[in-house]
UniProtKB/Swiss-Prot annotation:
Full protein name: E3 ubiquitin-protein ligase SH3RF3
Phylogenetic lineage: Eukaryota, Metazoa, Chordata, Craniata, Vertebrata
Record remark on domains: The RING finger domain is required for ubiquitin ligase activity and autoubiquitination.
Record note on modification: Autoubiquitinated.
Zinc finger (RING-type): 57-98
Length: 882
């Protein structure tokens, strides 16, 4: 902006000033003062009056004050001159460039930089000595004060009577006061080194490499900056170089370095309009950190731009780390889910501060100015427990993914899920969880996820960290900071980057690094066919002996292992049990609601003897979970009996318990796994379990407690042969699938019907009413998408949100069940081809027609391809409605 005038304009203004004030000699006197001040710059320091003479109006040559206005052409004039021009010419044109101004004088903005400079001059100490007590040093010959007006930049504008004076509006000139800018001049420091940080040499140093500073013992070395804990960059006799910190005694320490950070990655935003308050940068750029916004975001400045950026993208120096720690938000009340491993062991290199001493003061002044301005645009992180905050925030805000939120990004390209900003997705994917079992036999102690309290409102007893993930695929690192993934191993996730990459550490080796997020899945949502063996409570590190059952409340969910969580199967009763109590049965379509959550002590006290189990089983009906073999596990689970808690009426106490023996496990790759939900084992389809509130099996009646073991074995052999026949016939129709874990959704209504009746046989058609604890798409769910009614409900992530139990389900009920109804469909056209990345996904080719059945909140759709009739998942951005 132009503050000085050419002498042509000055001559015109001289007449106006003489006419208004009657002082014709004033312009000439002012010119003489300016020339004298310029000449005095060669021998003495420029005083305050000479500085103020440079800040004058180019029309009237009067000193500018805070009422000066800036025109759209960036020229600044005093208010009185602008008003006189409007009164005389009835329009406002710039006296310098003659550009017409379309607004009034009152609507013009003030010169903010001028206001700050004037304020700094007023606050400047007027004493004859400097703040340090020594007389003010004189500048070296030939140096003018013009660089101080431009933030230390070069140029001597305004030093000659014929040149205009400019004030730069760049970000480098946003100093808090003129005093801070004046101290950045290096010439006074050369005369008086006590004003600069310096140290005294304790030993002589000859220098070992080019660029080292040589000095002798006793030399006074000016310290320019601190490279790291071991080295300084200093100056001695006009020579600069590096010197070891142990060789000098620091007498005047370096000032506090400005909080800065070095960009580790490129940070760009796709939606410029929505994310206009984000600060974009490229790798290796140096940012100035202003303040912390929330757990994962900070506000910074790069050049003349101010915005927020993710902390994971920037390597902070010590000052920035202290600033971030100072502004760290208070942890939530229930913060046990946020436990994490120690961070990376690699030391963070300090970023070299700016060599000018005024940069720290300028940044601090700028920070104070913008601190209140950006509060209205701050973005918040939402943990898995802050349900109230999640529900109250707008979905348009950017929400930082916490390490406690088990969000799985199912995509081959980790950058494809960079924009996960939907608030409801976080509320669905990160429910609070309870611990159901604490006993284990493996040497690695890993927290195991169990059932979820969900929406019942029951407070959780024990919080479980959700940042333990299982590797679904092997990954070879491509860069030095990446972590190698081994399929089936466990990893602790420390941070989640916006581009879909995770930062974590291996629980086996402790090595940390970054890896793609779609290669791992949370332990709490590992599918039943996961890579690890399901574990039960053990005694002495081995499974329980035959005939011993483990009792637990169904509210406790499951006995989870490192790799998978075994869901509790719903109890199965016999026709005899229903015939005794026909009036106690709610409608068949109702579901079991868990009304109580277990404590950790209940889970630990589940191991009991056979006699104790039988005594407990006489109080409440029991259901059994048969042994289940995973794909990679050679071991089997012992029989587990579950009893409904505060749901079953005491009048059923006469029902005898059923004791189970381990049976040959059925691999999940068989047809039974494709048609059996993960919370009902394949052995249950053959009628092993007896005594439960729902489901009917006509194969056998429950025996009393005095039944001998050999009789049971003979019955089981017959049932086993029947089951194998059924599986042999179904295996030709079904294809085993092992889809990856996906984010859960909430369905408001669920209708369960006889899908198994046509796939396996009428014998197991009664086993159709149950709740599914997970949300992995299985074969039966894919059949439901093709037009059949779904076999089970998806009630949130690990949420067994059932209604009341069904006490009666005779075989005759199957005849009056409603017919399967078609799911809603929407026609979509594929606009971009998409290759499937897992068995749960379908291949899309450009131009294909897809019938969409469900739109998930993470942007993925489930639908059926018209070309081949296949049903599966695909990203919604690859299709369009028509």
């Amino acid at each position: 902006m132009l503050l000085g005038a050419s002498w042509l304009c000055a001559s015109k203004a001289a007449a106006a000033a003489a006419q208004s004030e009657g002082d014709e000699d004033r312009p000439g006197e002012r010119r003489r003062r300016r020339a004298a001040a310029t000449a005095a710059g060669a021998g003495e320091d420029m005083d305050e009056s000479s500085l103020l003479d440079l800040l004058e109006c180019s029309v009237c040559l009067e000193r500018l004050d805070t009422t000066a206005k800036v025109l759209p052409c960036q020229h600044t004039f005093c208010r009185r001159c602008l008003e006189s021009i409007v009164c005389s010419r009835h329009e406002l044109r710039c006296p310098e460039c003659r550009i017409l101004v379309g607004c009034g004088v009152d609507e013009l903005p003030a010169n903010i930089l001028l206001v700050r400079l004037l304020d700094g001059i007023r606050q400047r100490p007027r004493a004859g000595t400097s703040p340090g007590g020594s007389p003010p040093a004189r500048p070296i010959p030939g140096q003018s004060a013009a660089p101080t007006l431009a933030g230390g930049g070069g140029g001597a504008a305004g030093s000659t009577p014929g040149s205009p004076v400019f004030l730069s509006a760049a970000a480098g000139s946003t100093a808090g006061s003129l005093r801070e800018l004046a101290t950045s001049r290096t010439a006074p420091a050369a005369k008086n080194p006590c004003l600069l940080p310096y140290g005294k040499a304790l030993y002589s140093y000859e220098g070992k490499e080019p660029g080292d500073l040589k000095f002798n013992k006793g030399d006074i070395i000016v310290l320019r900056r601190k490279v790291d804990e071991q080295w300084y960059h200093g100056e001695l006799h006009g020579t600069q170089g590096f010197l070891p910190a142990s060789y000098i005694q620091c007498i005047q320490p370096l000032p506090h370095a400005p909080p800065q950070g070095k960009a580790l990655y490129d940070f760009e935003m796709k939606d410029k309009d929505q994310d206009k308050d984000c600060l974009t940068f490229t790798k290796d750029e140096i940012l100035t950190v202003l303040r912390r916004v929330d757990e994962n975001w900070a506000e910074g400045m790069l050049g003349d731009k101010i915005g927020i950026f993710p902390l994971l993208y920037v390597e902070l120096n010590d000052s920035a780390k202290q600033l971030i720690e100072m502004d760290k938000p208070c942890p939530a009340a229930a913060s046990s889910c946020n436990a994490s491993l120690p961070s990376d062991s690699g030391a963070v290199a300090s970023v070299a501060p700016s060599p000018t001493l005024s940069s720290s003061g300028a940044v601090s002044a700028f920070q104070r100015r913008v601190d209140g301005k950006k509060n209205t645009k701050k973005r918040h992180s939402f943990t898995a427990l802050s349900v109230t905050h999640r529900s109250s925030q707008a979905a348009s805000h950017r929400h930082s993914m916490e390490i406690s939120a088990p969000v799985l990004i199912s995509s081959s390209d980790p950058r494809a899920a960079a924009r996960i900003g939907d608030l409801a997705h976080l509320s669905c994917a990160a429910p609070t969880q309870d611990v159901s079992s604490s006993a284990g036999s493996t040497p690695t102690a890993v927290p195991r996820a169990a059932s979820v309290s969900g929406e019942q409102g029951t407070p959780p007893k024990v919080q479980l960290p959700l940042n333990v993930y299982l590797a679904l695929y092997a990954y070879k690192p491509q860069k030095s900071d990446e972590l190698e993934l081994h399929k089936g191993e466990m990893y602790r996730v420390l941070e989640k980057c916006q581009d879909g990459w995770f930062k974590g550490a291996s629980l086996r080796t402790g090595v940390s690094g970054v890896f793609p997020g779609n290669y791992v899945t949370p332990v709490s949502r590992v599918p039943a066919g996961g890579a690890g063996p399901p574990r039960n409570n053990v005694v002495g590190g081995s499974p329980l002996a035959k005939g011993i059952t483990t009792t637990m409340h169904p509210g406790s969910g499951s006995l989870s292992s490192l790799a998978t969580a075994t869901r509790p199967a719903l109890p199965i009763t016999t026709p005899q049990a229903h015939a005794q109590h026909p009036t106690a049965s709610p409608p068949t379509g109702s579901c079991l609601r868990h009304s109580a959550q277990p404590t950790a002590s209940q889970a630990r006290s589940t191991i009991s003897t056979a006699a104790h189990s039988a005594a407990q089983a006489q109080d409440r009906p029991t259901a059994t979970v048969s042994p289940l073999r995973t794909q990679n596990s050679p071991s089997r689970l012992p029989a587990t009996s579950l009893r409904p808690h505060s749901v079953v009426s005491p009048q059923h106490s006469h029902q005898p318990p059923v004791q189970m023996c381990p049976r040959p496990a059925i691999p999940l790759t068989s047809a039974a796994s494709a048609i059996t939900p993960p919370n009902v084992s394949a052995a249950n389809l053959n009628g092993e379990a007896g005594g439960g509130p729902i489901g009917v099996l006509s194969t056998s009646s429950p025996t009393n407690t005095g039944c001998k073991l050999d009789e049971k074995k003979s019955e089981k052999k017959e049932k086993k042969s029947g089951l194998l026949k059924l599986l042999a016939g179904a295996s030709t129709k079904k294809k085993s699938r092992s889809p990856p874990s996906v984010s859960p959704t909430h369905d408001p209504q669920v209708a369960v019907d006889a899908l198994l009746q046509g796939a396996v046989g009428p014998e197991v058609s009664s086993l159709s009413i149950h709740g599914r604890a997970g949300s992995c798409p299985i074969e039966s769910e894919m059949q439901g998408a093709m037009g059949m009614e779904p076999l089970h409900r998806k009630a949130g992530s690990l949420d067994l949100n059932f209604t009341s139990p069904s006490r009666q389900a005779p075989l005759s009920m199957a005849a009056i069940r409603p017919e399967p109804k078609l799911l809603p469909r929407e026609r979509y056209r594929v606009v971009v081809s998409y290759p499937p990345q897992s068995e749960a996904e379908i291949e899309l080719k450009e131009g294909d027609i897809v019938f969409v059945h469900k739109k998930r909140e993470d942007g993925w759709y489930k639908g059926t391809l018209q070309r081949n009739g296949r049903t599966g998942l695909f990203p919604g951005s690859f299709v369009e409605s028509f």
